[in-house]
């Protein structure tokens, strides 16, 4: 089942989500939108197992990173009615 990982611009660049991911889905990339000058990126979403550890680790109360599981994806992102 395919999962989607969405990184929002509320990311503070702390790397907590990257360190929490057991399958190395996330990585940090350069970004000038925060003090840390980096933002999380999800280049390997095909490896996501849907554990949502990245959400739990996020100090912004998972406002910066969200994992949408399979069919939950379109509903949660407001793409289905």
Curated annotation (Swiss-Prot):
Subcellular location: Plastid, Chloroplast thylakoid membrane
Positions bound to [4Fe-4S] cluster 1: 11, 14, 17, 58
Membrane found in the keyword field: yes
Biological processes, Gene Ontology terms: photosynthetic electron transport in photosystem I
Gene3D superfamilies for the chain: 3.30.70.20
Record flagged with keyword Transmembrane helix: no
Membrane topology: Peripheral membrane protein
Note accompanying the cofactor annotation: Binds 2 [4Fe-4S] clusters. Cluster 2 is most probably the spectroscopically characterized electron acceptor FA and cluster 1 is most probably FB.
Binding-site residues for [4Fe-4S] cluster 2, renumbered to this chain: 21, 48, 51, 54
Keyword entries, A-Z: 4Fe-4S, Chloroplast, Electron transport, Iron, Iron-sulfur, Membrane, Metal-binding, Oxidoreductase, Photosynthesis, Photosystem I, Plastid, Repeat, Thylakoid, Transport
Cofactor field: [4Fe-4S] cluster
One MF term in the entry's GO annotations: electron transfer activity
Enzyme class: oxidoreductase
Record's catalysed reaction(s): reduced [plastocyanin] + hnu + oxidized [2Fe-2S]-[ferredoxin] = oxidized [plastocyanin] + reduced [2Fe-2S]-[ferredoxin]
Record domain 4Fe-4S ferredoxin-type: where: 2-31, 39-68
Entry-linked PROSITE patterns: 4FE4S_FER_1 (PS00198), 4FE4S_FER_2 (PS51379)
GO cellular component, one term: chloroplast thylakoid membrane
EC code(s) of this entry: 1.97.1.12
Chief subcellular location: plastid
Quaternary structure (record): The eukaryotic PSI reaction center is composed of at least 11 subunits.
PANTHER family: PHOTOSYSTEM I IRON-SULFUR CENTER (PTHR24960:SF79), PHOTOSYSTEM I IRON-SULFUR CENTER-RELATED (PTHR24960)
Described function: Apoprotein for the two 4Fe-4S centers FA and FB of photosystem I (PSI); essential for photochemical activity. FB is the terminal electron acceptor of PSI, donating electrons to ferredoxin. The C-terminus interacts with PsaA/B/D and helps assemble the protein into the PSI complex. Required for binding of PsaD and PsaE to PSI. PSI is a plastocyanin-ferredoxin oxidoreductase, converting photonic excitation into a charge separation, which transfers an electron from the donor P700 chlorophyll pair to the spectroscopically characterized acceptors A0, A1, FX, FA and FB in turn.
Record-given protein name: Photosystem I iron-sulfur center
Source organism of this protein record: Psilotum nudum
